[in-house]
Amino acid sequence: MILTDILSSERVRVAARGAHVQSKDDALRALAALLGNGATAPGEADFYRVLVEREALQSTGIGDGVAIPHGALENLPGQVAALLICPGGVPFDAIDGGPVYILFAVLTPKRATGEHLKTLARISRLLRDTSFRQKLLAAADGREAHGLIRLAEEGRAA
């Protein structure tokens, strides 16, 4: 499995500076909407609820401007991901206290715990690379950001 198998370009968004994403809740709502893009059931409201419940346990802001909101749903047919890039930054209660610029959300069926952990590890490895994060932040739109992820996963320089 590669990330672009569960992350379509329609689920990637680059938010304009000063756009509607100015808080953690705004970011979670935007991610839920992206995750719900094309979904019938479960939908956006379920996705938002799961992300908020997970954030209530502990922030998924892992530092270096990155957050990986995630969770599991009983009736989800397969893994789904969304990417939200906020060049202006979002306060997110990250572990390092800094704002978050890159939010990569993943939802998984409850029965797929192993798959979920592998996906989170894959995202973490990808976003550990400072130069890759800078390229994502410089992406003009979601399609370009999606292409950068695809290239990185194919082992080509992004």
State each model region's role.
Residues M1-A158:
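Cytosolic covalent-transfer regions centered on His/Cys nucleophiles
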